[in-house]
Protein backbone atom coordinates (compact mmCIF):
# COMPACT_ATOMS: atom_id res chain seq x y z
CA UNK A 1 0.00 0.00 0.00
CA UNK A 2 1.44 3.33 -0.97
CA UNK A 3 1.76 6.15 1.61
CA UNK A 4 -1.02 8.22 0.04
CA UNK A 5 -3.59 5.39 0.33
CA UNK A 6 -2.41 4.60 3.83
CA UNK A 7 -2.92 8.21 4.91
CA UNK A 8 -6.37 8.35 3.29
CA UNK A 9 -7.40 5.08 4.98
CA UNK A 10 -6.18 6.40 8.35
CA UNK A 11 -8.24 9.59 7.94
CA UNK A 12 -11.37 7.60 6.99
CA UNK A 13 -10.96 5.26 9.97
CA UNK A 14 -10.45 8.23 12.33
CA UNK A 15 -13.58 9.99 10.99
CA UNK A 16 -15.69 6.82 11.31
CA UNK A 17 -14.40 6.27 14.86
CA UNK A 18 -15.25 9.89 15.75
CA UNK A 19 -18.77 9.58 14.34
CA UNK A 20 -19.32 6.29 16.18
CA UNK A 21 -18.08 7.74 19.46
CA UNK A 22 -20.31 10.81 19.03
CA UNK A 23 -23.40 8.69 18.38
CA UNK A 24 -22.58 6.51 21.39
CA UNK A 25 -22.22 9.52 23.70
CA UNK A 26 -25.48 11.07 22.45
CA UNK A 27 -27.38 7.82 23.02
CA UNK A 28 -25.89 7.46 26.49
CA UNK A 29 -26.93 11.03 27.39
CA UNK A 30 -30.46 10.50 26.07
CA UNK A 31 -30.81 7.25 27.99
CA UNK A 32 -30.56 9.20 31.26
CA UNK A 33 -33.49 11.45 30.27
CA UNK A 34 -35.90 8.86 28.92
CA UNK A 35 -38.87 8.23 31.16
CA UNK A 36 -41.77 6.26 29.77
CA UNK A 37 -45.44 6.81 30.62
CA UNK A 38 -47.32 4.00 32.34
CA UNK A 39 -50.77 3.51 33.79
CA UNK A 40 -51.14 1.50 37.01
CA UNK A 41 -52.36 -1.52 35.01
CA UNK A 42 -49.41 -1.32 32.60
CA UNK A 43 -46.98 -0.99 35.49
CA UNK A 44 -48.27 -4.11 37.27
CA UNK A 45 -49.27 -6.29 34.29
CA UNK A 46 -46.74 -5.13 31.69
CA UNK A 47 -46.92 -2.80 28.69
CA UNK A 48 -47.43 -3.71 25.06
CA UNK A 49 -47.80 -7.09 23.39
CA UNK A 50 -44.67 -8.43 25.13
CA UNK A 51 -45.96 -7.33 28.57
CA UNK A 52 -42.70 -5.52 29.32
CA UNK A 53 -42.43 -4.25 32.89
CA UNK A 54 -40.11 -1.46 34.03
CA UNK A 55 -37.04 -2.36 36.07
CA UNK A 56 -36.62 -1.37 39.72
CA UNK A 57 -34.76 1.95 39.74
CA UNK A 58 -36.11 3.04 36.33
CA UNK A 59 -37.37 6.61 35.90
CA UNK A 60 -40.94 6.76 34.69
CA UNK A 61 -44.16 8.74 34.63
CA UNK A 62 -47.41 7.27 35.86
CA UNK A 63 -50.89 8.65 35.39
CA UNK A 64 -54.16 7.68 36.98
CA UNK A 65 -56.91 8.69 39.36
CA UNK A 66 -56.19 9.24 43.04
CA UNK A 67 -58.24 6.71 45.00
CA UNK A 68 -60.60 8.50 47.42
CA UNK A 69 -59.50 7.95 51.02
CA UNK A 70 -55.99 6.81 50.07
CA UNK A 71 -54.06 10.02 50.77
CA UNK A 72 -51.89 9.67 53.88
CA UNK A 73 -49.90 12.65 55.14
CA UNK A 74 -47.08 12.59 57.69
CA UNK A 75 -47.76 15.25 60.33
CA UNK A 76 -44.05 15.87 61.07
CA UNK A 77 -42.87 16.26 57.47
CA UNK A 78 -44.04 16.89 53.93
CA UNK A 79 -44.21 13.17 53.11
CA UNK A 80 -47.39 12.07 51.39
CA UNK A 81 -48.45 8.74 49.98
CA UNK A 82 -51.51 7.98 47.88
CA UNK A 83 -52.85 5.26 45.64
CA UNK A 84 -53.43 5.56 41.89
CA UNK A 85 -55.84 3.43 39.89
CA UNK A 86 -57.00 3.17 36.30
CA UNK A 87 -59.19 0.21 35.34
CA UNK A 88 -57.33 -2.50 37.23
CA UNK A 89 -54.53 -2.80 39.79
CA UNK A 90 -53.47 0.04 42.07
CA UNK A 91 -50.05 1.60 42.54
CA UNK A 92 -48.78 3.46 45.61
CA UNK A 93 -47.04 6.80 45.02
CA UNK A 94 -44.83 8.29 47.74
CA UNK A 95 -43.92 11.95 47.47
CA UNK A 96 -42.05 14.41 49.66
CA UNK A 97 -42.97 18.01 49.04
CA UNK A 98 -45.91 20.33 48.66
CA UNK A 99 -48.63 18.90 46.46
CA UNK A 100 -50.17 21.13 43.77
CA UNK A 101 -53.19 23.19 44.84
CA UNK A 102 -55.42 21.27 42.42
CA UNK A 103 -54.45 17.85 43.83
CA UNK A 104 -57.57 16.10 45.16
CA UNK A 105 -58.83 12.60 45.74
CA UNK A 106 -60.79 11.27 42.77
CA UNK A 107 -58.85 13.49 40.32
CA UNK A 108 -56.44 12.57 37.55
CA UNK A 109 -52.73 13.23 38.13
CA UNK A 110 -49.37 12.44 36.55
CA UNK A 111 -46.44 11.62 38.83
CA UNK A 112 -42.84 11.48 37.70
CA UNK A 113 -40.43 9.40 39.73
CA UNK A 114 -38.49 6.19 40.21
CA UNK A 115 -39.85 2.67 40.59
CA UNK A 116 -38.68 1.42 44.02
CA UNK A 117 -40.84 -1.72 44.29
CA UNK A 118 -42.99 -3.50 41.69
CA UNK A 119 -46.00 -1.35 42.59
CA UNK A 120 -44.46 1.60 44.48
CA UNK A 121 -43.21 4.84 42.91
CA UNK A 122 -40.99 7.35 44.74
CA UNK A 123 -42.13 10.54 42.98
CA UNK A 124 -40.10 13.72 42.65
CA UNK A 125 -42.83 15.61 40.78
CA UNK A 126 -46.64 15.48 40.91
CA UNK A 127 -48.75 17.26 38.32
CA UNK A 128 -52.48 17.82 38.80
CA UNK A 129 -55.19 18.80 36.34
CA UNK A 130 -55.41 22.47 35.43
CA UNK A 131 -59.19 22.78 35.47
CA UNK A 132 -62.30 20.62 35.48
CA UNK A 133 -62.14 19.72 31.80
CA UNK A 134 -58.38 19.40 31.21
CA UNK A 135 -56.63 16.07 31.39
CA UNK A 136 -53.28 15.20 29.79
CA UNK A 137 -53.85 13.24 26.57
CA UNK A 138 -51.90 10.24 27.88
CA UNK A 139 -54.03 10.04 31.01
CA UNK A 140 -57.30 10.59 29.13
CA UNK A 141 -56.47 7.74 26.75
CA UNK A 142 -55.43 5.45 29.59
CA UNK A 143 -58.47 6.19 31.75
CA UNK A 144 -61.26 5.73 29.24
CA UNK A 145 -64.21 4.19 31.03
CA UNK A 146 -63.41 5.46 34.53
CA UNK A 147 -65.95 7.75 36.13
CA UNK A 148 -64.45 11.16 36.89
CA UNK A 149 -65.44 12.50 40.31
CA UNK A 150 -65.79 16.24 40.61
CA UNK A 151 -64.59 17.73 43.90
CA UNK A 152 -67.32 18.30 46.46
CA UNK A 153 -67.44 21.83 47.82
CA UNK A 154 -69.60 23.01 50.68
CA UNK A 155 -70.78 26.41 49.47
CA UNK A 156 -73.29 26.86 52.28
CA UNK A 157 -71.60 28.93 54.96
CA UNK A 158 -74.41 28.30 57.44
CA UNK A 159 -74.80 32.05 58.16
Curated annotation (Swiss-Prot):
UniProt subcellular location: Cell inner membrane
Periplasmic side, ranges: 30-159
GO molecular function per UniProt: heme binding; metal ion binding
UniProt keyword annotation of Heme present: yes
Signal peptide: none
Ranges of the Cytoplasmic topological domain: 1-8
Pfam families: CcmE (PF03100)
Residues passing through the membrane, by range: 9-29
GO cellular component terms, semicolon-separated: plasma membrane
Purpose: Heme chaperone required for the biogenesis of c-type cytochromes. Transiently binds heme delivered by CcmC and transfers the heme to apo-cytochromes in a process facilitated by CcmF and CcmH.
Record-given protein name: Cytochrome c-type biogenesis protein CcmE
